[in-house]
A protein has these predicted regions:
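Active-site-proximal alpha-helix that buttresses catalytic centers in soluble enzyme cores
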Residues: 2-74, 128, 222
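Generic beta-sheet signal
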Residues: 4, 149-155
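Active-site metal-binding loops of divalent metal-dependent hydrolases
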Residues: 10, 157, 209-210
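Glycine-rich phosphate-binding loop signature in dinucleotide/nucleotide-binding domains
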Residues: 40-43, 141-149
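Conserved histidine-centered catalytic loops in small-molecule metabolism enzymes
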Residues: 44-77, 102-115, 195-222
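Short beta-strand scaffold positions
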Residues: 49-50, 132, 154-155
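Phosphate-handling substructures
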Residues: 65-135
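Acidic, low-complexity terminal tails and accessory targeting/binding regions
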Residues: 68, 81-101, 147-150, 165-222
């Protein structure tokens, strides 16, 4: 069977002028991930990453930690949704800077509004548009893995949660799918690995959010 490993990017720079840059911890998480995968004899036939700086930097750190020379392909289908746009579109979002705890509270309320699908015109990318492109990206990566290859995908928590929710309950209605996504999205660890196996009956979720290479201060969610 083919294998697709979905990797969340390392810790980005929350609260800085440019979130889309790995922190020092994020770089270390990427290197630790690469070393851990190499120790387990993972040898990817292809590395795919989203088209964001944090995806590129995580891929660079992972490749360095693993000592891989795999080809890297960019697929914007694995990009994160515009989380700041979603938060900013919520009418009750406070003005001014928010600390991590307050931002998380506002983020969860704002994403619930977004996933409800009742205000699609308020967002540059609607919830159906986001989930549709992620499912298409997952299909591409599974096809690239083929019957016996290994594709490592560097993405973000939102797309990984969307792909995982779709695989866990393919027949879920829109509301149930959104609820499952919300639960999964809040717990995806930086540089964690979610494993998808690809067989004759299609892709199946094998594991979600593996992170044994992390401990102490290297274990982060934001």
């Amino acid at each position: 069977m083919g294998v697709v490993l979905l990797v969340r990017h390392g810790q980005a720079s929350f609260g800085s002028d440019d979130y889309d840059v790995l922190s020092e911890t994020g770089w270390e998480q990427g290197r630790l991930l690469g070393a851990w995968l190499a120790d387990r004899a993972v040898n990817p036939t292809l590395v795919v990453r989203g088209d964001m700086r944090r995806h590129r930097e995580t891929a660079e750190a992972m490749l360095a930690g693993a000592g891989w020379s795999a080809h890297v392909e960019v697929d914007p289908g694995w990009d994160e949704f515009d989380h700041l746009g979603v938060v900013g579109a919520h009418p009750e979002t406070p003005t001014g800077e928010l600390d991590r705890r307050e931002f998380q509270r506002v983020f969860e309320v704002a994403t619930e509004r977004w996933t409800a699908g009742l205000h699609d015109g308020d967002y540059p990318e609607s919830w159906p548009g986001f989930t549709g492109r992620v499912r298409t990206a997952l299909d591409r990566s599974c096809a690239q893995a083929g019957p016996g290859g290994t594709v490592v995908v560097v993405s973000s928590g939102g797309p990984i949660a969307a792909a995982s929710a779709a695989l866990v309950d393919p027949g879920a209605d829109d509301a149930a799918y959104a609820r499952l996504w919300n639960r999964l999205n809040t717990v995806v660890v930086n540089s964690s690995v979610t494993r998808v196996v690809v067989g004759s009956t299609g892709p199946r979720l094998l594991t979600f959010n593996e992170h044994p290479h992390l401990e102490g201060e290297t274990l982060t969610y934001r």
